[in-house]
Amino acid sequence: MYVDWEYYKIFYYVAKYQNFTRAARVLGNNQPNITHAMNRLESQLNCVLFIRSNRGVTLTPEGELLYSRIASAAVQIQDAEEELSATATLEHGAISISTTETALNIYLSEKLRAFHTEYPGIRLRISNHSTPQAVQAVRNGEVDFAIVTTPAEVENGLKMVELMPFYEVLVGGKTFTALASQTLNLKELAGYPLICLNEESMTRSFYRQFFLEHDAVLKPDTEAATTDQMLTLVKSELGLAFMPEPMAAPLLTSGELVQLHLQEIIPSRSICLVYDHHRPLNTAARKFQQLLTKAGARSAERK
């Protein structure tokens, strides 16, 4: 069966944005042409790919299957086109990175700023994911690499490199100031409201294991989707939370938050680079990866 690649390209954008009009705008085309192309694609493949409504489109199971195959190819073709137009001086190019919110906040944003200052012509595509989702994006070929926080599970074929260790601290709002002069243990935390990330997060798994190792049970009163949400909830006096020290430090210094001390030592975690060493990177991505790994090596030497 021969199907024009242009149809698959259009399908990728329609599926990505779940909207014919928006896909047409991105492709510099018009909505009737996009609709016609997708009708032709469905006819040639002899299946329905979209469920159409006034609010846009959703993928059918057949559409989901096709998108899972097309997405990786589309991203790699985009990268190939952009790399061919790049110069040796990195005046043009693109980097796609999947990252966790914590990794972005306490590590990656600073590295991106330095890189963008030196190479302003390089386009950056940053996607915010949980650690498992970020690793999956690398495995699927949807991004050049991922910057994640441990714990992380990496399968064969992918490589993980530690870039920077970090520590977390137990913090609370001003109403918990009296506790700051005490030393608590994990079992005693059951008597105080605790804020954690949701059940599916690797951070939640990390702390669940940490509590179990000390014969305590993690029972949060409030669950949040992101560390930024946790920080907002802590500042709103809704409870205590384990936060990355670099994120909490400014608020601890200003007195907006207080640090609580534990008898148990919270294990350190790491910011890590995850990439597929079987898949070559474009010039810009390779340059940025080298910058990250060199910085990580210097960090390891200072330990």
What are these regions (language model features)?
Residues 193-214, 281-285, 289, 298-302:
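Secondary-structure junction motif
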Residues 130-135, 139-142, 149, 203-259:
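Hydrophobic hinge/microswitch elements
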Residues 157-195:
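Flexible hinge/capping segments at coil-to-helix
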Residues 92-155, 224:
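Central regulatory/effector-binding core of bacterial HTH transcription factors
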Residues 42-61:
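A short LG(V/I)-centered, amphipathic sequence patch enriched
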Residues 107, 258-302:
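A late-sequence structural motif
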